[in-house]
């Protein structure tokens, strides 16, 4: 290996292998440990096939693709035989799959082949098994997500399939979340919000199609007891409207008053907690609202065995080109910068001089906003341009500005009421974005 320290800037450094020194790690004290998990093979083998759609061809300035966030997996006893089956969502052009458990084996469900074929034209972003019509079996909510469809497409309506008790499904023929909202759904959760004995729904909008940076809305759908849902967001939770780009949510009785409260997270969002006051959800103003991240997942469990459930929230992580803090946040400026009727989101970082610079390179910006080519004819003219050099201050003042001040996957320990304390966790949890979290006593040590 070759070690160089305190290297000066503006120079070419030449390394030669013959000048390197021998170096090896000392593993003498390392003890072999028995793996906690072993690889297993479930047959039949289900392979997820992603569509060829490329988000960047439509929106040049986004930092990741929202059309390929699947597949999602969940489990539930679909056919009433007291064994948990596996459900796997699908990309556009493919059908969702159910693996029916039979003892130690699985077989691919064939009963619902025709009705699942009707779902091929949607990007199935989530499958929620729950008893919608109170008949004792699990029905299936299929959410339609991604950005591949037109905002006018009927395929953006979510679908509710009702179970006949034998694992055979029929379409409820409901337009969900309602007839006026064709959305790209990111998450759906069930819970008895109004304590009337049936399961109601929260549906979260992942993204405004073609308008990355515009906040989406959450929807509260109330069950009439027979599996018919009505959108009552305006009456029950108006503050869910335009709340953000929602990725996950959870119902939990945080204050132990017998009512399910709601937690909602997403991109450029704080951790939003809504107290269920019986007839209305009211947003809680606490420190978690200031924890603005690129949140992907929320998991609730009692980590310290104090009888109170804590929060584990999956974020982007700290192992990428992006950095964010409260003193130097990532900012997204959203506006129709070129006045063509379509908005653009410009993602920026704050430099040491306090100015915001776009992450996008000159050619990416010009691909999205053609008028900038005249202003910046070459890379030399662009290399020191901050956001105020690129766009007039007037249009920046009119822009929606969203920020991110933490990229850490985080644990928040429940205190009293709606208060939580953030604790440090191992650095390994920050090596990649976290999209799914589970908790269990995997090592059989009692916690």
Predicted regions and their residues:
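Hydrophobic or amphipathic alpha-helical targeting/insertion segments
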Residues: 129-163, 189-191, 195, 199
